[in-house]
Amino acid sequence: MEPPMEQSGGEQEPGAVRLLDLPWEDVLLPHVLNWVPLRQLLRLQRVSRAFRALVQLHLARLRRFDAAQVGPQIPRAALVRLLRDAEGLQELALAPCHEWLLDEDLVPVLARNPQLRSVALAGCGQLSRRALGALAEGCPRLQRISLAHCDWVDGLALRGLADRCPALEELDLTACRQLKDEAIVYLAQRRGAGLRSLSLAVNANVGDTAVQELARNCPQLEHLDLTGCLRVGSDGVRTLAEYCPALRSLRVRHCHHVAEPSLSRLRKRGVDIDVEPPLHQALVLLQDMAGFAPFVNLQV
């Protein structure tokens, strides 16, 4: 290995210990580099070939990689260089790569990291069903995945995920507008027992049929986001109240067919709902009107 650079400004003092003289495996990697932000590590590797080797060894041992730590945008060549030796990743987040990330960029990374448990691909619209198939097939421990705003996710892609990911707990399908009730019903029947968090927000194709099937098959469901699901109504919410004792939060803003009586049972259980009761809404409106604020008590 290339020796470290000499100190600038003169020779090293006798007995002095340089950073790279410390044990790499036992000291520098676990106790120093693990605490240095990724962006700073990329700068550090420019100091010398020895530092570059140290940083590459650290990158190869990464358990968590979030491209946002590098910056709001990351070039394809940089991503390839950063992840070329990584074989132990458990968490992978690639949202900053959404403009250019293709199947051929992602699939090799997935193949080298079968231990992945969390993958965030929000907004990665250039991917296809092939990438999701590789993820489902090669990462059996997958627990969390975000596919928000991935328009290419269709019913067939979701079926593959449901069939091959037995540990799935959290799934973000926000704005995956190709998905319809049938696909969500299949997901509920295959993986509902373990699901804890699900977002179906901004999908006008999802209705009460899907919500009711989720309720009946997801006893551990804690968080459900139905924001903007225009076909969801009170029947679906009532079924949630009946079959989901673990539910902690429900998002139904812009679900215009969901009436307050169906939500009241959940409110009494302490479920966090993003729509205020009608009385509270009326009082807030009154407060906004000139002359009423001194007389309105929101605690009524």
UniProtKB/Swiss-Prot annotation:
<dbReference type="InterPro" id="IPR055411">
    <property type="entry name" value="LRR_FXL15/At3g58940/PEG3-like"/>
</dbReference>
<dbReference type="Pfam" id="PF24758">
    <property type="entry name" value="LRR_At5g56370"/>
</dbReference>
<dbReference type="GO" id="GO:0030513">
    <property type="term" value="P:positive regulation of BMP signaling pathway"/>
</dbReference>
<feature type="region of interest" description="Interaction with SMURF1">
    <location>
        <begin position="113"/>
        <end position="269"/>
    </location>
</feature>
<dbReference type="GO" id="GO:0000086">
    <property type="term" value="P:G2/M transition of mitotic cell cycle"/>
</dbReference>
<comment type="pathway">
    <text>Protein modification; protein ubiquitination.</text>
</comment>
<feature type="domain" description="F-box">
    <location>
        <begin position="19"/>
        <end position="66"/>
    </location>
</feature>
<dbReference type="InterPro" id="IPR006553">
    <property type="entry name" value="Leu-rich_rpt_Cys-con_subtyp"/>
</dbReference>
<dbReference type="GO" id="GO:0005737">
    <property type="term" value="C:cytoplasm"/>
</dbReference>
<dbReference type="InterPro" id="IPR001611">
    <property type="entry name" value="Leu-rich_rpt"/>
</dbReference>
<dbReference type="GO" id="GO:0030282">
    <property type="term" value="P:bone mineralization"/>
</dbReference>
<dbReference type="InterPro" id="IPR032675">
    <property type="entry name" value="LRR_dom_sf"/>
</dbReference>
<feature type="repeat" description="LRR 1">
    <location>
        <begin position="141"/>
        <end position="162"/>
    </location>
</feature>
<keyword id="KW-0677">Repeat</keyword>
<dbReference type="Pfam" id="PF13516">
    <property type="entry name" value="LRR_6"/>
</dbReference>
<feature type="modified residue" description="N-acetylmethionine">
    <location>
        <position position="1"/>
    </location>
</feature>
<keyword id="KW-0963">Cytoplasm</keyword>
<dbReference type="GO" id="GO:0016567">
    <property type="term" value="P:protein ubiquitination"/>
</dbReference>
<dbReference type="GO" id="GO:0019005">
    <property type="term" value="C:SCF ubiquitin ligase complex"/>
</dbReference>
<protein>
    <recommendedName>
        <fullName>F-box/LRR-repeat protein 15</fullName>
    </recommendedName>
</protein>
<keyword id="KW-0433">Leucine-rich repeat</keyword>
<dbReference type="GO" id="GO:0031146">
    <property type="term" value="P:SCF-dependent proteasomal ubiquitin-dependent protein catabolic process"/>
</dbReference>
<dbReference type="GO" id="GO:0009953">
    <property type="term" value="P:dorsal/ventral pattern formation"/>
</dbReference>
<dbReference type="Pfam" id="PF00646">
    <property type="entry name" value="F-box"/>
</dbReference>
<feature type="repeat" description="LRR 5">
    <location>
        <begin position="246"/>
        <end position="267"/>
    </location>
</feature>
<feature type="repeat" description="LRR 2">
    <location>
        <begin position="167"/>
        <end position="188"/>
    </location>
</feature>
<feature type="repeat" description="LRR 3">
    <location>
        <begin position="194"/>
        <end position="215"/>
    </location>
</feature>
<comment type="function">
    <text>Substrate recognition component of a SCF (SKP1-CUL1-F-box protein) E3 ubiquitin-protein ligase complex which mediates the ubiquitination and subsequent proteasomal degradation of SMURF1, thereby acting as a positive regulator of the BMP signaling pathway. Required for dorsal/ventral pattern formation. Also mediates ubiquitination of SMURF2 and WWP2. Required for bone mass maintenance.</text>
</comment>
<keyword id="KW-0833">Ubl conjugation pathway</keyword>
<dbReference type="InterPro" id="IPR036047">
    <property type="entry name" value="F-box-like_dom_sf"/>
</dbReference>
<comment type="similarity">
    <text>Belongs to the FBXL15 family.</text>
</comment>
<comment type="subunit">
    <text>Part of the SCF (SKP1-CUL1-F-box) E3 ubiquitin-protein ligase complex SCF(FBXL15) composed of CUL1, SKP1, RBX1 and FBXL15.</text>
</comment>
<keyword id="KW-0007">Acetylation</keyword>
<dbReference type="InterPro" id="IPR001810">
    <property type="entry name" value="F-box_dom"/>
</dbReference>
<feature type="repeat" description="LRR 4">
    <location>
        <begin position="220"/>
        <end position="241"/>
    </location>
</feature>
